[in-house]
């Protein structure tokens, strides 16, 4: 073998060795990688197994805990639903033994069925009265309330707190029995007092003359047989007789304006008042009575005063007013008062019509709602303003209808007479503007007709609330025109909320809500920015 061949062979061997080493190195790398992967897979598998075992163990433990907790809850529920509560005594209020024996399940069902919520800062958790025999009252008061089948929800829940001396806020629809809710504890307190009452002990503030008169009529049912004097004072009538009445009365119902007049002239002393009621508080604020209310409250002694506030809605303004003069009030709400909602016992019918055909349509509706077996049914018709009401009144009289009317063009005496005629059945038609939209308790109104839609959807809800009161059913028939289309969205929401049909013609106007403005009468004053100062114009 030559030297050259030897060198060539050696070179070939070196290349082969290097290639072999490279292959061994590569194989080792692959093997290491595989081993590493296998090791990782083994570790992952082990961790997964451990995790699964741990999860199964935890699930088993959770299942056992849930089972134990459920068993504990069942035991507790059994105790609360089957065991009577301990008898409660707070101040002058002693819970009736029969009420104490009621299973908690019965109480819970009452709250659920009547959509009752109670916010009680003192955590007294007083049980509602399910029957009149579950409360101990003066005999005459007991006899008067026994004429009714059972307490209304607002009465059932508020009476125990009021008889315990607590301040109470009642948020409930009109027609829910609010007058007796505050009236019964007030009169009972006077009758069971250790000393004979002197001066004004009970003061009820009301936004309108009509509502004040109505409250007075209800309270007289409680006071007339027990020797307690009660009077009502409001504007529009001479003061002389009111001065004489108020001087000898222990219970006074008043509108803010007339009461302030009597206070300022020295005819009224409110220092003895120890039970004060603001009825329709939200409406009083709407009417601009806030400062008047504060001045009246300032005439009483806050230390000894028990204060009540009843309201159909719970806006910010009412909350702020309550916080300024009430002491840890118990808030009782009946129904869903956070949202604007209509009484579900009312059948709502909305017709979209041409504005020019409304009064002709009204005559057709009266034939429908006051014929045959419905001949003597009470019908309440709402106009928007007194000018419209006067025109419609003349038209109805011309067409042979006997109609009673209450609106701003009439004197107080004429309005009172009209209400009495409607209540007594002498007239089965009442024509009203929104002065009567809230608070008036006119029994057995079967139908409300909205001839012209009100300025706000809130007013619509209050208007139709004149029917379907005290557990009864009713009908509200509304004539809606293109002039009110900006209110269509809010009306649709109310109809949907009460599970009432929504006409296609109404939906065509759109379902979004706009600012409060009436097409025929202009902007609703609350939506106009009154804070803007006039712009000064200068000429060079």
Swiss-Prot record:
Keywords: ATP-binding, Helicase, Hydrolase, Nucleotide-binding, Nucleus, Ribosome biogenesis, RNA-binding, rRNA processing. One of its GO terms (biological process) is endonucleolytic cleavage in ITS1 upstream of 5.8S rRNA from tricistronic rRNA transcript (SSU-rRNA, 5.8S rRNA, LSU-rRNA). Residues 36-52 have a biased composition (Basic residues). ATP binds at residues 172-179. Residues 361-510 form the Helicase C-terminal domain. The keyword Nucleotide-binding applies. GO terms for molecular function: ATP binding; ATP hydrolysis activity; RNA binding; RNA helicase activity. Residues 1-35, 53-62, 68-79 have a biased composition (Basic and acidic residues). A motif (DEAD box) lies at residues 279-282. Residues 159-332 form the Helicase ATP-binding domain. It catalyses: ATP + H2O = ADP + phosphate + H(+). It is found in: Nucleus, Nucleolus. Residues 1-89 are annotated as: Disordered. GO terms for cellular component: nucleolus; preribosome, large subunit precursor. Its EC number is 3.6.4.13. ATP-dependent RNA helicase required for 60S ribosomal subunit synthesis. Involved in efficient pre-rRNA processing, predominantly at site A3, which is necessary for the normal formation of 25S and 5.8S rRNAs. The Q motif is unique to and characteristic of the DEAD box family of RNA helicases and controls ATP binding and hydrolysis. Belongs to the DEAD box helicase family. DDX5/DBP2 subfamily. PANTHER family: ATP-DEPENDENT RNA HELICASE DBP3. This is ATP-dependent RNA helicase DBP3. It comes from Candida glabrata (strain ATCC 2001 / BCRC 20586 / JCM 3761 / NBRC 0622 / NRRL Y-65 / CBS 138) (Yeast). The gene is DBP3.
